[in-house]
Amino acid sequence: MFLLPLPAAARVAVRQLSVRRFWGPGPDAANMTKGLVLGIYSKEKEDDAPQFTSAGENFDKLVSGKLREILNISGPPLKAGKTRTFYGLHEDFSSVVVVGLGKKGAGVDDQENWHEGKENIRAAVAAGCRQIQDLEIPSVEVDPCGDAQAAAEGAVLGLYEYDELKQKKKVVVSAKLHGSGDQEAWQRGVLFASGQNLARHLMETPANEMTPTRFAEVIEKNLKSASSKTDVHIRPKSWIEEQEMGSFLSVAKGSEEPPVFLEIHYKGSPDASDPPLVFVGKGITFDSGGISIKASANMDLMRADMGGAATICSTIVSAAKLDLPINLVGLAPLCENMPSGKANKPGDVVRAKNGKTIQVDNTDAEGRLILADALCYAHTFNPKVIINAATLTGAMDIALGSGATGVFTNSSWLWNKLFEASIETGDRVWRMPLFEHYTKQIVDCQLADVNNIGKYRSAGACTAAAFLKEFVTHPKWAHLDIAGVMTNKDEVPYLRKGMAGRPTRTLIEFLLRFSQDSA
C-alpha cells in the first residue's frame, strides 16, 4: 500500500503497518469498481483530535480503527477542501478518500452571505469525487457529511466536465449516498446540480452546434421528459413578425440562422387559472458584436451569451422534475448577433413591441434589444412575478466579478426572496441600483424614445437595467445580470473551469421556497 501525498518520515511507519496488514498492497490488487468519500472536521482546539463524521466513525470502526491510525501518520490534519487517499482498507472499496470539511457546525456567514457549512461540504465532496474519477473508478459512495443535499450537489457539480467532442473522455463516475441516510435530500441535491449542469452544457456547446433551433429542441426534449404538465412552443420568424417584435428582429436579421422565440410552460398548480411566474432569458447563441464588432480575444466565450436563456430554461426543467405546485412560463428570444449587409447599423432606429422607438447606437448592446420585446410579451400572462436573466454587460463583470449575480429590482419583497435563496445555495446575488439617475441617461435620446446605450461610459450595468425598465410595468420584476458569473476559472472550487451555469440553483431554490410559501 502507498499513500499520496506522504511525508518521508511516515514511509517507514507505512511499511511497518503494511507488514501488520493494516491495509493491502495497493489499488491494483483491490476491486477497482467503487470508491468511498468520507468527511472529517477540523480540530476545534489545538489538543483535540480531528472528528470524523458519523459515516466516517462507522467506517473507522468497521476497519478496526485503521483509518484514523493511517490518517494520523500520513500528514497534518486536513484543511477544508483538502483530500487524502487510502487504498485497500476494505474489500468493498478500492480507494477511500478522506476530505476536510472545516469547522463542525459552521452556519450562515453574514459577511460572506452564504452558509459556510454547506459550501464546505460542496467543495470537499467535489474534491473527493474528482480523486476517484482520476483513479478511473466508475462508482463512488459519498458520505452525506451532515447535509445530503449539499453533498449531492458537490458530487454532481464537481464531476461534470464538457468533453463530448473529445475522443478521450473522462471516466463517467456514478455517485450515490453512502449508508441509509436522507435519500430524499440526496435526490433533491442531484436534481439541483443536474439543472445547473444542463445550463453548463447549453452554454459550453460550440455555437455552430447550439444554434437557436437546436437550443429550443434540447429544451423541448428535457422539459417533455421532466413532466407531462408541460407545453413547448417553438415560435418561428413569422410569429415574431406577427407579434411586432421589431427590436428582436433587428438583431436577428444580421445572421443566416433563423431566429426562434422559445415559449415553455409548466402547469404544476392544481388551479389552472393560477397566474404564472414568468422567466425571461437572453438567448444570443453567438455574439460577435454585430457591426460594432468585438475584439477577437475571447470572442469564443460568446457562445455562452445565451446563458440567461440556459439558466431560466434549466430552472423550469428542474421545477418540473420537482413537481412544484406552481405555474411557470419561460420565454427565450433566440438568435445570433452577426455583422452582414442586413445587420443593424449604429444610428438605426427600431420599434419595440410596446411601440417605443429605440436608437441603436451600439450593435453590441443587443441583449437588451431582444429582451425588450420578450419583457413586453411577458406581461400578457398576467404574471405574479417577472424575472429576467442575461449575460448583459461587461460592466457587471467589472463591478462584481464572479462573486455574485447583480440583481436590479423594483420590489424589495422579490429581492429578499432571491437573497435568502442564494444564501442557501451559495450562488450569491447582490442588489444593484435602479435609480432615475440612470434612466435619464438613456431617455435623453436624439432620434428615438430611448437609446440602447447610456450617455456616459460609467455605470454600464445600471444604464442597461434602466433601459429594460422602460419595457416593464409589473411591480414585481427583477433583472439578473449574470455576465460576471458566466464562467468559472478557479473561483468556485466545486465547478471545473468553463461555463458556470450560474445562478440556476438559486432560481430553483427561490421557486421551491415560493411554492412552499404559497401552499
Swiss-Prot record:
Major localisation: cytoplasm
Catalytic activity: Release of an N-terminal amino acid, Xaa-|-Yaa-, in which Xaa is preferably Leu, but may be other amino acids including Pro although not Arg or Lys, and Yaa may be Pro. Amino acid amides and methyl esters are also readily hydrolyzed, but rates on arylamides are exceedingly low; an S-substituted L-cysteinylglycine + H2O = an S-substituted L-cysteine + glycine; L-cysteinylglycine + H2O = L-cysteine + glycine; S-benzyl-L-cysteinylglycine + H2O = S-benzyl-L-cysteine + glycine
Pfam families: Peptidase_M17 (PF00883), Peptidase_M17_N (PF02789)
Keywords: Acetylation, Aminopeptidase, Cytoplasm, Hydrolase, Magnesium, Manganese, Metal-binding, Phosphoprotein, Protease, Zinc
Binding of Zn(2+) 3, residues: L202, M203, T205, R303
In-chain residues carrying the UniProt-annotated modification Phosphoserine: S42, S54, S180, S194, S238
Record protein name field: Cytosol aminopeptidase
Annotated source species: Sus scrofa (Pig)
